[in-house]
Amino acid sequence: MGKIEAINITNISEENTFYVNQAILEKGKGIVNDSYYENFKEKKEQVTLINLEDINNFNNEIRQNIDAKDFRRNIIVSGINLNELINKKIKINEITLKIHEICQPCKYLQDRLKIPGLVKMLVNKSGVRAEILSSGSLSVGDVIKILK
């Protein structure tokens, strides 16, 4: 089982993201009050998740302390390997998510954080994209269950 460590949204695309203690996820729409709510290209992009362990490892590698929110993923988790969950479902309270694919880092993030080589360093360590199959609310500290 995993755990939600933080929830991260932005009201305006490409603006700074910020933490919230809880969020409402709506099937087929995304995270309420997030700039991408009802504004994603594909259903698999409704929500993003990233492992806190990958963030910590990256920070150790570059000897900096980049805040988890600066990676611009919606849900920061611990205790589960997200990359192993491609095409699987997870449950958080009444919410069911289907993990579709690994998010690869983008040059936008590298330029924004001003870290040369970031894209290469974060290949396969930059989170996953998921589809919301059932609506509900989640909070920091909630448990994540992997469905069979």
PLM segments and residue spans:
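Metal-cofactor-dependent catalytic cores
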Residues: 1-148
